[in-house]
Amino acid sequence: MSFDLNLLKPVMADDGAVLNIVHPETEEVIEGMTITVLGQDSKIYRKLQLGKQQAALNRMSKGKKALDLDAEKLSEDSIDDLVKITIGWTGLSLDKKELEFTPENVRTVYTEWAWIKEQVQEFVGNRANFFRANG
């Protein structure tokens, strides 16, 4: 008997999956606070990764190291990538006003609230979050 591989496609990678944000102290879901992100198998995420690989190859062809590791630059790049794969949110407010979903606001949230960024990174890194439930 064979198994249909189509059943194992992370079909939500390009559609986006919803992360329920968890309180950093109580570890309980914050009701209504969600962030919708694309998965690591999405076309956009794969294009971002290919761009990084191409940049490393270009550096090597110029006789430079593939990566000059700089923690600050890596952190900025990580946030840049997350901004590009974040496609929506609900329930985020700042100073008692709803926080509009814009790339600038996404960048601010991921920069100022590292615990949110870490939850998003972990969620994106888990392919299981991007499969539709069967049946």
Regions found by a protein language model. Give the residues of each.
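Mid-chain, well-packed structural core segment of small domains
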Residues: 74-91
